[in-house]
Amino acid sequence: MSKITEEEIQQILPINGPSFEEVKNYLYKYNNEYIVIKCGGSVLIDQNLFNNFINDISILNKLGFIPVIIHGGGKRISNKLNEAGIKSDFINGLRVTDEKSISIVEDVLNEFNKEITEALKKNGCDGQGITNKQNNILFVEQENQNLGFVGSPKEISQSIIEQIVSKKKVPVIAPLGLDKDNQVFNINADTA
């Protein structure tokens, strides 16, 4: 079933939650299934939420599920842009990413990616970063000229995810992609 014992599962279950038997049936049914989890940037900057998130991912992994993480970076990106004197504009909830801001967006997302993989490792769960610089899987087209360097995924290289999973690692995806000219684009984590 999984890498976790019945006793460990009992310790994880909420006091007023489902019985072990109910959970066991669910575990057998969905064992070895991919679970794609989007983690917003606000979770990543609140240490308590971040620690809970990392713990939950580790538990899912121990239970035999295959978590795949895609993360955002919203608030930290806004803070870094403000520090650089760059105003954040949004159109329909999407950050306008111009030539000045794309490198800051890229740096923040790659930094978060590294922090997540390191935290997973400290929690006994191997993570593998997927960024535009390392194992890029997202190939994009520009979403809209008014948004600047914001892309829409057109192709996803699933083979890289499968290779990482075959090594018993959790893929951690930064929402960045490359176009046909290898230009970096910011991607809304909800659509990546």
Regions found by a protein language model. Give the residues of each.
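Nucleotide/pyrophosphate-binding catalytic subdomain
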Residues: M1-A192
